[in-house]
Amino acid sequence: PRKGKEKKEEQVISLGPQVAEGENVFGVCHIFASPNDTFVHVTDLSGXESICRVTGGMKMKADRXEXSPYXAMLAAQAV
């Protein structure tokens, strides 16, 4: 006899800072725009802990559009 699929509970893992709801978190947004790509990197105030890192290439599929202003806007919105 076939067994039914077992349902697995998904655990949500938060890698960012632990804050209460409605509380603000401050960070530093480092933006590097090269001729080939745009990087948006958010760190804590000391610059040692990364909170988020997004590139234009992560948002665009075509290599020629990685460095476009549209890809940089999508990367900034993802942060």
From Swiss-Prot:
The keyword Ribonucleoprotein applies. Signal peptide: none annotated. There is a cross-link at residues 59, 61 (Glycyl lysine isopeptide (Lys-Gly) (interchain with G-Cter in SUMO2)). GO terms for cellular component: cytoplasm; nucleolus; ribosome; small-subunit processome. GO terms for biological process: ribosomal small subunit biogenesis; translation. Coiled coil: none annotated. One of its GO terms (molecular function) is structural constituent of ribosome. This is Small ribosomal subunit protein uS11. The gene is RPS14.
